Every structure is written in C-alpha cells, then in structure tokens.
Amino acid sequence: MKLNKAFLTLGLAAALLQMPASSFAQTAGGNRQNPLLTKSSLPFGAPDFSKIQESDYLPAIEVAIKEQRANIQKIVNNKKKPNFQNTILAYEESGALLEKVTNIFFGLTSAHKTPGIAETEKKATPLLTELDNEISFNKKLFERIKYVYDNEYKKLKGEDKRLTEVIYKSFVRSGALLSAEKMERMKQINSRISELQQEWGNLLPAATNNAVVWVNSKEELAGLSDADIAQCKKDAESRGGKAPYCIVIINTTQQPILTNLQNRELRKKVYMASIHRADGTNPKFNTFPIVTEIAKLRAEKGKLMGYANYADYSLEKTMAKNSKNVDDFLKQLIKEYAPKADAETKAIEAYAQKTEGKDFKLQPYDRFYYSAKMKKEILNITDDEIKPYFNIDSVQVNGVFYAAHRVYGLNFKQRKDIPTYHPDMKVFEVSDKNGKPIALFYSDYFRRPTKRGGAWMSAFAKQSKQRGQLPIIYNVCNNAKAPEGQPSLITWDEVTTLFHEFGHALHGILSDCKYNTLSGTAVARDFVEMPSQFNESFASIPEIFDHYARHTETGAAMPADLKERMLKSISFQTAYSLGENLAATCLDLAWHKISEDEVPSPYMAGAFEKEELHNIGLLNTQIPPRYSTSYFNHVWGGGYAAGYYSYLWTEVLAVNIADYFAKHGALDPAVGQAFRDKILSRGNTKDQMEMFTDFTGMEKPDASGFLKARGL
C-alpha cells in the first residue's frame, strides 16, 4: 500500500491555527514557518525551493505523519455507520499533507541527493514504513472500509465506485485479511524490506561512482569526440582529479562510450568496471547480501499471501495477471529473437576479423565498437555526424513540445520566475488550445554526482479535481552537459529518451480525474510504460523530425540523405537491444519465482544468475542483461519487482497504438483528442484493458507489429 492518501481541505487560516509547534523550524534568527507546511504562494502551489531548506524536510515529515495518524483515528472513532463519505473519502483525504511533503522530498532523494538529503532519508524511511504498517494493518479501519465495499459498492457510480474498489483491494493485498500472527510477520517483512531498499539506494550509487575508470592521457581516449573528451576531463575534475580524465559508468551494463573508444584495453576496463561495480569485487561495494535477503523476504511475503511465489502475488493486479502468462509472452519473443541474435553476432565478428585477423574473438566490450564501424561502412553514418542536429534545447522545444502541440493542442511557456532545486532545471507552464493553464512541467536533463542514473518522470503534485490541484510534473535525465557557452548535443537514443519520458509526463499533465489515488500514472505496471513508449514514435515522424533536427550552428535541416541513413540505422542490428531486455526481464522473474529455500546465498548469487540465463537460452556473453543482478535498480530499489517485463509488454501495446494513429492520422488532433479522452486523461478510473479496447477496437494486444518493428 502507498502512504499519503489525502489532502487538507481546511483553508490556510484554519490549517495554521491547527499547526503544531514543530511546524516551525529553528533558524539563526529565531523561528520561521516551515515552507513545506504552509500553502505555497507560487502558481499551481508549486514548491518554493527558494525558501525550502534541507533542515525543513524531517520536521515537516514528522508533522505530516502526526496529522495522518490523527485523521485515521477520526475515521476509526466515528460512531456513524460506515459509508463512502465518512470512510472511503475520509481515508483518501487523510494524508495529503504527508503526500505533499514526501513528493517534494523524494524528488530530491533521486535527483539531488546531497549528504543532508541522504541523512534525512535515513531518518525518515523507518518513520514512514512504521506509519504504512500501522495503516495497512489497522483492523478497525479495514472493518469500516470492508463494510462500505460489502454494502455500498454496487450502488456507487463512476470514480466513487472505482476508488472504493482500489482502496479495499490495496488493503487486502497488504494483508488485512491475514491472521494476527501472519499480519505481525507481514509488518516485520515490510519494515525489513524498506530498510534494505534504503541500504541499496545508498550503496549502489556509491558503487557506481566508485567504478569510474581513470585515464592518464588524452591519447588513450582516441576515437572520442572533442566534446566527449572535454566531458571526461570535467568529470575527472569534479571527482577529485586522480588523473586528468575519467570515464563515468552509467546505470546499464553496456556503456555507450565504448562505441567510439579505439583503445581495446581501455574498453575492457570500462566494461569490467561496469559489470563488477557492485558484486563484491571491491569488498566495500557488494549488493548481493541485500539482494538475497530481499528475495527471501519477498518469497515469504508471496507465500503468506497464499500465492505460489512472489511473482504471482505481484502480477495479480497487472494486465498479465500471473507469471505463466508472462512466461508464455517471453517464450514467443525468445523463439523469434535467438536466431537473429546469433546471426548478428557472427556478422559483427566476421566484420572485425577483416581488420583484426581471422583469430580475433569478439568480446562484449568490442561489440558496440565494431557494430558502429560496420554500420558506418554499410550506412555511412556515425553518432558524431548526426549529433550536431540534436541540440537538446531544440529537441525539447521544437520536438517534444511541438509534437504535444500538434497532437494535443498544448502550449508551453517557460517560467523563469518559479524557483527550482538546481540551476539546470527549467520550468514550463502548460496551457491547452484555449490558453487555459493546466499544468507545470519541470525538466532536469543534465547529470551530476548527486543524481542517480537513468531517466524518469514523477510529480511534485498529482492532479485531483477533489482537491482542486492541477498537476506539477517533472522529467529527469542524465545527459552530458556541454561546457559553458556551447550547445549540449545528444544522440538519437537520448532524443527518444526525451520523447519517452515526456510520454509519461503527458500521462500526468493530461490527467482529468476526481481523486488523487486514481489520477495520472497510477495504473497497472504493464500499462504505465505504454504512453511513454508510444510517444517515442513521434520522434521520427517527418513533420516533427524536420522541425527539431536542425544543425546547431547553421540552423539547416538535416539533409534528406543523412536523415534516410539515420532512420535506417535505427533498425540496424536490433537483436542486441531486445536481447539485453529479455535477459534482464527473465532474470527479474527468476529471482521472484523461487521459494525462500531456493534463494541462493550472497556468495552464490552470481552463479544463480548464470544458471537461470542458461536454462532459458539467454546466457550469451555477447548480449549480457541490460542490468545484472547486483545493479538491477528497477527490481531491488524501485517498483519493478517481477515487473521488468512490462517494458516489452507495453512496447507491444505502444506499437498497436502507433499503428492506429498511423492509420487514422498520426498528427490528427481529433485522433489525439480521442487518445487523450479514452486513455491519457483517465488514470486508473477504468480497467486498462478496457481502455485499450475502447481506443483501438482490439480485444487484446497483437505482438506481430512489435516483432516486425524489431526486424523479427
């Protein structure tokens, strides 16, 4: 279950009258109001980062926890017969202050984790877990919720009915129907998992930062562009300067920098640093003890809840429903993928042998390098040739925003008057086709040491008509920032990442739901990635592409020949990306389909990974998992346990949606409006398969288009 179910409906004056003394934080000059506990004067109620101090977060969380406890107690002590208003809605509204505070705080724990934020997280996490357990296992509260579900549910309509169902089932899935003994054990499991995930969240970024590869001379970086070399120098300086240059490891197994790095020994060092970052090769950085304990606890949790394993427990609330359906889906993809993967690997090795000799054996750290050379020879194209056309500012404004304008009628105006938590962050006011403001959107695109790897979307405030709250949404990425005065140029993969994350953002921006719990991206895990993956399709539509792909110095459009070669390169050797995702997906499921007794020791965790990949035919040193067990943050630190398959599952949905748009008008505002009305605005107010059918007319997703798009 999630915390933070509610929003204060009291006016500001009433709220201040009730505000306890701890809502005021000490400063050198005396007492000051904690800005996290007062109403923001900024547009949309945006967080005022010019006033918020790191020392404000913990006191605000403590006050908000106290308030939610009091609100829950009011529900429990209510002598009136339980009904939607005094129980379901009261519960929905019980923790809005806590949600407001933690939405802001947890935005920083991922994107700007300073030592102060890390220390606050360490103190706040057990407090929040304790509250979550208190609420999830509050017998009297659940009795009231169950009474409404049993006696009033069938009479309710629309979102009131859906909210009642979602809240009731979330309590059941948290263990509300368990015996007292099992309930107590579930509390212990939840608390321990929370502690372990906090340990993971501190250890993995430290391991990744430690895994940088120091480089003594510019000559060793031969093959890299001047911009990349400058970035290596900048990264070295920001990390203490042990050597003139350093190569920073990103969150995935393979490292994009290997594409151009000529020095084979250095390529090997970078790759080895990546795969061994957290497996205990350096004893200070070993996540396997955390992994195996979490796996044991999850297996026990699934068993306590009456399921064969944790995967089946986790998947019950998804479109897939159970692990067998996911296995069947993956087997179809593996069957189609395996021959193509073998053929691609042989082709790359044969190409490399033309220059390196017939005895040359392709290694995983060679693959990107020789694949890129092969692609250049066949298609006559390199990243360095196309990057000047992908200025990140143009991609955002003239690509991502322009597509949203064409399809959904949205307009974007930068708001430099709204403060942010870091100078790199930008704020935009989003308005509809009639000029009515509907959301704020923040973008934080550049990497820094305080930011975890990857790219994501979240919200400082979710949309809710009940609360009168418009959405405040943000995207975070990890692009390299150019030196001062120079444009930041990105690769095609990074272009699609911007479109992808903004697809998530649109799911939040265009939300039009009554209740916070149901709004925006609060949908099944194997549906939530569909809007983002679908939004990637706009990146290559000619009218959109030509609008943003302009040379950063001349402003000229990308020449037709170069554009054609670039678009062809997108489908060049596609087996790798599918294979690395399949391997990671199957690895995730393997860890969550085993019983407690089958979980290996930390020492044997690496061997378990290899054995499981071998058993399903995916132990391929040439195509390693996108994330290996020891640094698989989605699974051990995020919300994707037994759910990483959803990226492939939703790609099938996204291709079906894109095919519908292509057939009926890819940039037709009427089609965009229908997609907005039937899916993007609906949140979790309706079963997601029904939404999919309502829009496409298809009874179920069809994987044939996905396979074709992957060249299978």
Per-segment meaning from a language model:
Residues 27-232, 246, 661:
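N-terminal helix-rich structural modules
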Residues 9-19:
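Bacterial N-terminal signal peptides
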